[in-house]
């Protein structure tokens, strides 16, 4: 029986490499998968899933208007699994499509993404994945400033933390760092340096 999985983590927790590893494991057994990613993520190139260690794969870019259910339903032969990167950028309708893929097509769906934004609010896609997923798993990493588990993302501009602004501002380690709750509220000023 297929299930909807949401695997979330902060920036730099290894979500993209994990999705590429899952795809490899399926394909090594001769089981095709479908890779999807958000059209919004243009850090590397639209339509690619890229890890910080240099691995990358082509993926179908999805947007707010994409009917993911119809896209998957039209694929023949059916994939063994649907894998989605940057799932925080999904809409409510996109997530409902994922649930339909699981329930009506009996295809497992694994979505990977951030849970909360730099202001500590849930992304729309993450909110509905938390509500509808059968299994939810945290991908862990450590705080930039200490050894605690990182659970939040701190947006940086010119070495200073930023707590206001638009929710979606595409960027990598030069713009965001993963931190624990303590250091989200009180980042150590003497250790804040612009990331390269």
Curated annotation (Swiss-Prot):
Molecular function as annotated in GO: ATP binding; thymidine kinase activity; zinc ion binding
GO biological process: DNA biosynthetic process; thymidine metabolic process
Active-site residue list: 86 (proton acceptor)
Record: residues binding Zn(2+): 143, 146, 180, 183
One Pfam family here: TK
Subcellular localization: Cytoplasm
Major subcellular site: cytoplasm
E.C. number(s) listed in UniProt: 2.7.1.21
Bilayer-spanning residue ranges: none
Domain of life: Bacteria
InterPro entries: P-loop_NTPase, Thymidine_kinase, Thymidine_kinase_CS
GO CC, any one term: cytosol
Major enzyme class: transferase
Entry keywords, A to Z: ATP-binding, Cytoplasm, DNA synthesis, Kinase, Metal-binding, Nucleotide-binding, Transferase, Zinc
Record note on quaternary structure: Homotetramer.
NCBIfam families (alphabetical): PRK04296.1-4, PRK04296.1-5
Family: Belongs to the thymidine kinase family.
Annotated protein name in UniProt: Thymidine kinase
Organism: Streptococcus thermophilus (strain CNRZ 1066)
């Amino acid at each position: 029986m297929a299930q909807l999985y949401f695997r979330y983590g902060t920036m730099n927790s290894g979500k993209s490499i994990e999705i590429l590893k899952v795809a490899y494991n399926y394909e090594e057994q001769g089981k095709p998968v479908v890779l999807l990613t958000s059209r919004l993520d243009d850090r590397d190139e639209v339509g690619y899933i890229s890890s910080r260690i240099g691995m990358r794969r082509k993926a179908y870019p999805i947007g707010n208007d994409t009917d993911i259910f119809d896209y998957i339903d039209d694929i023949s032969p059916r994939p063994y699994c649907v894998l989605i990167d940057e799932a925080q950028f999904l809409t409510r309708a996109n997530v409902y499509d994922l649930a339909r893929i699981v329930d009506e097509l009996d295809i497992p769906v694994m979505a990977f993404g951030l849970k909360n934004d730099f202001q500590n609010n849930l992304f729309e896609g993450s909110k509905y994945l938390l509500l509808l997923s059968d299994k939810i798993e945290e991908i862990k990493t450590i705080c930039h400033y200490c050894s605690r588990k990182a659970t939040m993302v701190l947006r940086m501009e010119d070495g200073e933390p930023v707590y206001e602004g638009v929710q979606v501002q595409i960027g990598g380690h030069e713009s965001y760092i993963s931190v624990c709750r303590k250091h989200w509220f009180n980042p150590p000023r003497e250790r804040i340096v612009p990331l390269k």
